[in-house]
Structure formats: C-alpha cells, structure tokens
C-alpha cells in the first residue's frame, strides 16, 4: 500500500506568494476582472502608475482600477495557518506602526489603556471577544454631515454633536452607517451614503483601505509606513497622514 506523501509549505508557494514582491501574500487582494491575487499594498501601489494587471497585462479599469479590488479573507486565514508565525509578525508590525503614527488630534492620552497593544500568548478567543478590537490599529475619523440644498432627507439627517471618533482600521463603511443610524435615530429603512473626497464608498471598504487609497492622496503632511519583511521598501511606499480622516454622510441618492 502506497504511503501518502506529506506536503511541505513550499509546495503551496505558487498559490500563496505575491507576484509583485515575491513574499507571502499579506492582506491578499484579488482583481475581480482576472482573479489574480496580490498583497494589498503591492497592488494599490501598482495601480497608482498603471491600470493593467501586473500578472496578465489585461486592463482592469479605464479610470479607477482600485474599485475592482476585493480582499480575500479566506485565503488570508489559509496562509496564516500554513506559514508558522506569519500572523504574529504582521500583527506586531501593524501595532508598532500605529504606536508611532497614531493621530493626536482626538485629545486622547498616548498611554491610554485603549491604545496599549495587548499580547495574546495563548490565542484565547474569549479575550479577543472582550477586547472589541481595541488592540487593533486605531484611526481617528471626523464624520461630517454633507448638506445639499433642497435634497430630500436633509431635515432628517443632522450633524453629530460629537463628530470625532476613534475606531479600528478594520471597521467597514457598513459599520459606520449603522453607527450613524443609531446616533441620528434614523428609521431602519433609511439609507445613507458615506463619501470620502466626494466619492461614495462601498459598504465593505475598511477604514484602512479608504485611508490608503482615497484620503492619503490629498497630499499634505505624509508619514512613511515601514514595509513588511516580505516587501521591498521604497520612497514611493505606502503613506499615511497624521490628522483625522474626514468622511462625509448624506441621505442616499437614488440615481434611478
């Protein structure tokens, strides 16, 4: 009876490494047009200079290829389980970056309990549940009410009394909409648009994704983000700003 061959991690390398940086896929992001997957940082940087897929050369989008990107959380979990220590390395890298570059405008003390990185040596899921993502990298956001004269719903959607919030970079636009609906006491059927720099954001976009692909392009007071060990650092690497990111909200506009 033939013995079953034991597979090594290197056997899966063609499926779990990035075509651009040649390292393991970090936050694997798939191009929906051709289904090729890259590190999120790598593909975002590539699309700043080109609208074509770096692997097959097909045009992804005529004007905004970033709209055709989707995070692959399932593949991310598979890679973390295949490669020992990769998850811990990435969490430590993110934590170190946000400790050095977290915004100061929200008035919170640097040494506050919410900002301290928490070490989970046992990987206890119960501790993660109690944490409510407080040990995630944090980002300061300003939620500004966008008023259009004469638009239906302007009397319902008001500005927040406290429009500055601090949340995890993994929070999605969908969660922000739920937060706004709760604070503004909107009916469950009432829908909002959330915008950044005048562009409507998709409900699955995370704050980190919007920060990197929309807000930082405004071009003032940039700070460099240290690349991970699997990527090549350059002067054109990912950049972050030091002041709160502004998101605007308004009643949903039906374009018919």
Swiss-Prot record:
SMART domains: RING
Entries under Pfam families matching the protein: RAWUL, zf-C3HC4_2
InterPro entries: PcG_RING_finger, RAWUL, Znf_RING, Znf_RING/FYVE/PHD, Znf_RING_CS
Any GO BP: regulation of transcription by RNA polymerase II
A GO cellular-component term linked to this record: X chromosome
Protein location: Nucleus; Nucleus, Nucleoplasm
Domain of life: Eukaryota
SUPFAM superfamilies documented for this protein: RING/U-box
Annotated region described as Disordered, given as residue ranges: 94-133
Zinc fingers, RING-type class: 18-57
GO molecular function terms listed in the Swiss-Prot or TrEMBL record: histone H2AK119 ubiquitin ligase activity; zinc ion binding
Residue stretches of biased makeup (Basic and acidic residues): 94-103, 110-120
Keyword terms, alphabetized: Metal-binding, Nucleus, Repressor, Transcription, Transcription regulation, Zinc, Zinc-finger
Function summary: Component of a Polycomb group (PcG) multiprotein PRC1-like complex, a complex class required to maintain the transcriptionally repressive state of many genes, including Hox genes, throughout development. PcG PRC1 complex acts via chromatin remodeling and modification of histones; it mediates monoubiquitination of histone H2A 'Lys-119', rendering chromatin heritably changed in its expressibility. Within the PRC1-like complex, regulates RNF2 ubiquitin ligase activity.
PANTHER family, A to Z: POLYCOMB GROUP RING FINGER PROTEIN
Subunit structure, as described in the record: Component of a PRC1-like complex that contains PCGF5, RNF2 and UBE2D3. Interacts with RNF2; the interaction is direct. Interacts with CBX6, CBX7 and CBX8. Interacts with AUTS2; the interaction is direct. Identified in a complex that contains AUTS2, PCGF5, CSNK2B and RNF2.
Designated name of the protein: Polycomb group RING finger protein 5
């Amino acid at each position: 009876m033939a013995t079953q061959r034991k597979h090594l991690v290197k056997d899966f390398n063609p499926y779990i490494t990035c075509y651009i940086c040649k390292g393991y896929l970090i936050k694997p992001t798939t191009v929906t047009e051709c289904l090729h997957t890259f590190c999120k940082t790598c593909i975002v940087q590539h699309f700043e200079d080109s609208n074509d897929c770096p692997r097959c050369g097909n045009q992804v989008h005529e004007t905004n290829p970033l709209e055709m990107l989707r995070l692959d959380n399932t593949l991310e979990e598979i890679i973390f389980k295949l490669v020992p220590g990769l998850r811990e390395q990435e969490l430590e890298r993110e934590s170190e970056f946000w400790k050095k570059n977290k915004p100061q405008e929200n008035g919170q003390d640097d040494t506050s309990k919410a900002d301290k990185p928490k070490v989970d040596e046992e990987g206890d899921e119960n501790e993660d549940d109690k944490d409510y993502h407080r040990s995630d990298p944090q980002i300061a956001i300003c939620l500004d009410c966008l008023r259009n004269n004469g638009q239906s719903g302007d009397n319902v959607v008001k500005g927040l009394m406290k429009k500055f919030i601090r949340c995890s970079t993994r929070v999605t636009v969908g969660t922000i909409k739920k937060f706004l609906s709760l604070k503004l006491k909107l009916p469950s059927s009432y829908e909002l648009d959330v915008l950044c720099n005048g562009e409507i954001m998709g409900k699955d976009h995370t704050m980190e994704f919007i920060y990197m692909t929309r807000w930082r392009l405004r071009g003032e007071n940039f700070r460099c983000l240290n690349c991970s060990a699997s990527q090549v650092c350059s002067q054109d690497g990912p950049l972050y700003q030091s002041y709160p990111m502004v998101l605007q909200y308004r009643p949903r506009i039906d374009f018919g």
